[in-house]
Amino acid sequence: MPKMKTNKGAAKRFQKTAGGIKFKHAGKRHILTKRTTKNKRQLRPNSILPKCEVAQVLRMMPYA
C-alpha cells in the first residue's frame, strides 16, 4: 500500500502536542491599526484546537 500523503497546509498550521493540537489565531499579520487593543490581545495566545475539530485535522496529518 502506498504512503499516505500529509496535507502540507495543515502541517504548517497545526502542531500536535501532548495537550492537544496547537494552532495560531488568524488575522494577526498586518493592517492591525483598525483592530482594538482588546481584539489584538485576544488573538495573541496560541490555542488548543477544540475536540470537535481534532479528528478532521488528524486525518490531514496521518503521521502526526
UniProtKB/Swiss-Prot annotation:
GO cellular component, one term: cytosolic large ribosomal subunit
Any one Pfam family match given in the protein's UniProt record, by short name: Ribosomal_L35p
Coiled coil stretches, renumbered: none
Record field: transmembrane: none
Keywords: Ribonucleoprotein, Ribosomal protein
UniProt GO BP: translation
PROSITE patterns: RIBOSOMAL_L35 (PS00936)
Gene3D superfamilies from the UniProt entry: 4.10.410.60
GO MF term (any one): structural constituent of ribosome
Family matches, as NCBIfam families: rpmI_bact
Family note: Belongs to the bacterial ribosomal protein bL35 family.
Official protein name in the record: Large ribosomal subunit protein bL35
Organism: Vibrio atlanticus (strain LGP32)
Taxonomic lineage: Bacteria, Pseudomonadati, Pseudomonadota, Gammaproteobacteria, Vibrionales
